[in-house]
Amino acid sequence: MAKTTKRASSFRRLMIFAIIALISLAFGVRYLFHNSNATDLQKILQNLPKEISQSINSANNIQSSDSDLVQHFESLAQEIRHQQEVQAKQFDKQRKILEKKIQDLKQTPPEATLRERIAMTFPYDSHVKFPAFIWQTWSNDEGPERVQDIKGMWESKNPGFAHEVLNHDVINALVHHYFYSIPEILETYEALPSIILKIDFFKYLILLVHGGVYADIDTFPVQPIPNWIPEELSPSDIGLIVGVEEDAQRADWRTKYIRRLQFGTWIIQAKPGHPVLREIISRIIETTLQRKRDDQLNVNLRNDLNIMSWTGSGLWTDTIFTYFNDFMRSGVREKVTWKLFHNLNQPKLLSDVLVFPKFSFNCPNQIDNDDPHKKFYFITHLASQFWKNTPKVEQK
């Protein structure tokens, strides 16, 4: 019994030591673990600014690399655009050279008449669109600021149109460029004794080559050019657009006009090569060269009738009526006279010529909303007649 009690007491002491050892071991492990975590955390905190800095630097490097890449692409795109512009200029230059060679190859027969040579060099295609050109001429009598204002009005009403305002030097260069193969045209242009006659001649010439709209510099657009042709008409059926200049109501009309009803020349829209243009150019050539042979080139510029009958609206009117009454050209069977356009109040299409009323290209400065003609008001014309200020007679 005493021996059993001794064994039990020894076992209890052993258990107590074991428990104490386990507790000590647990505290030791915890202490070590705690110190280890603290050290790691401290290291992490110490290294954190460095890692953040590295990340920021890395991001900056990436951004810098992207910026360099974008700059490289922009530089490359600019270089490509420059090369395209250079190529476009080269192509345009080659095109002009090719056009000149093609024109040189258009050899007309030696026996061809003047009209045949003009027709072969500048053929007419009624099915092409009206070219989007606006042609105007500028004399020194119009100040450059005013010319720029007028040019701006035309361009604001007609975006997308090529618009050229040409002075006398440019006109001279263009005439010699386009018509060197028809010497009679060059001789006529040089022989015409005044600027106004040359400008009249040039307006027909430039429309013959390029087509589009010719407008005197003292005209102002009320509506865009594409609005001129009524919706019920097809542009492919029209080759020439003109307006009535004068529809005389008085018996003494001969003191101011060549014809009782005249078509104006301050606004003309045409397709290239139109037969009316070819004919009026031929008539001006014949008249001018005959006057040159007869030494009768002096002209009284203050007499409107002289200009109208030589290069202006009188000759223009006669040429158009000749076209109407030539069945082989116009296809019109009945005889056409001024009476067909007398008191015209809406556009009239005859053959491929669209004729507008007098008020269309000479509309009022003030337009009422209830004006019945409002939709056909296209142009305001000042009719400045700058040649009135020139000397009475110009001599070559």
Swiss-Prot record:
InterPro entries in the cross-refs: GlycoTrfase_DXD_sugar-bd_CS (IPR007577), Nucleotide-diphossugar_trans (IPR029044), Och1-like (IPR039367)
Glycosylation positions in this chain: 37
Location within or outside the cell: Golgi apparatus, cis-Golgi network membrane
Lumenal side of membrane: 35-396
Entry keyword annotation includes Phosphoprotein: no
GO biological process terms, semicolon-separated: cell wall mannoprotein biosynthetic process; protein N-linked glycosylation; substituted mannan metabolic process
Key words of the record: Glycoprotein, Glycosyltransferase, Golgi apparatus, Membrane, Signal-anchor, Transferase, Transmembrane, Transmembrane helix
Gene Ontology CC: mannan polymerase complex
Ranges annotated as spanning the membrane: 14-34
Membrane topology category: Single-pass type II membrane protein
GO molecular function, one term: alpha-1,6-mannosyltransferase activity
Chief localisation class: Golgi
Cytoplasmic side: 2-13
Documented EC number(s): 2.4.-.-
Quaternary structure annotation from Swiss-Prot or TrEMBL: Component of the M-Pol II complex composed of ANP1, MNN9, MNN10, MNN11 and HOC1.
Family: Belongs to the glycosyltransferase 32 family.
Note: Present with 7160 molecules/cell in log phase SD medium.
Its job: The M-Pol II complex possesses alpha-1,6-mannosyltransferase activity and is probably involved in the elongation of the mannan backbone of N-linked glycans on cell wall and periplasmic proteins.
Entry protein name: Putative glycosyltransferase HOC1
